[in-house]
Amino acid sequence: RPGPVLVDVTKDVTAAECEYSPRVPKPVERITASIKEEDIDKAVTLIKKAKKPYVFVGGGAVISEASDELKKFVEKVDAPVCDSLMGKGAFDGSNERYTGMLGMHGVSECDLLIVVGARFSDRVTGNAKKFAKNAKILQFDVDAAEINKNVRTDAHVLGDAKEILKRINDKLDNQDHSDWMEHIKSYKLDYPMRYNRDILNGPLIMEKIYE
């Protein structure tokens, strides 16, 4: 009948020695064939038109090891950055542009949400119909199934995040959104993260590690 199955392997089998010819695994090539130049151009156009861009980083940026390209991209766009739980580590958490994890109401003021390798889970969007309702959405993702899955996008680029960011960086001039960045900084000053510094706790430990 259906149920748990235990496979018991004897010690003489697990400790046995044998000869074999190892196979050297082939390197996995990044998916670049799916990246269309017209999609890159459309993304660049949207970025240039934006006045209040916001970059949302997901696990795809971590998997593609896109940290360097992401940092350069964010500086060129001149935008604040947030991330998902899976996207943590792709962007420096001590950088002044970093605003923490994306919340359900944290994207209400941006006019362009640039999504790098994130999948719009319900813990991010809440009510998807009301998510980032004042913004156009530009999504970069390697998985076609994630495009327009939970949230409709205005434009997207399908492919490896590292390669997408590299190509856009090559075409994008430095943008100036100093007023927008000052506005974001004012929020960080008005609503700082507070925690008890007299006892050992997670945020304090991470702060010391960053230092």
Range-by-range predicted roles:
Residues I35, K48-L113, E211:
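Anionic-ligand anchoring segments at beta-strand to alpha-helix junctions in alpha/beta enzyme folds, i.e.
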Residues D83-H183:
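Glycine-rich, acidic loop regions that bind phosphate or pyrophosphate groups
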Residues H183-E211:
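Active-site diphosphate/adenylate-binding microenvironment
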Residues P22-V24, S67-D78, A128-K133, A155-H156:
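Short, solvent-exposed amphipathic alpha-helical segments in soluble enzyme
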Residues E29-K42, I199-N201:
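A general structural motif
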Residues E17-V28, H183-M193:
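Gly-rich Lys/Arg/Thr-decorated short loops/hinges at beta-loop-alpha junctions or inter-strand turns
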Residues V9-T14, G59-A61, A144:
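Glycine-rich beta-alpha junction loops
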Residues R1-R23, A43-L46, G106-L138, K171, ...:
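Structural signature of the thiamine diphosphate
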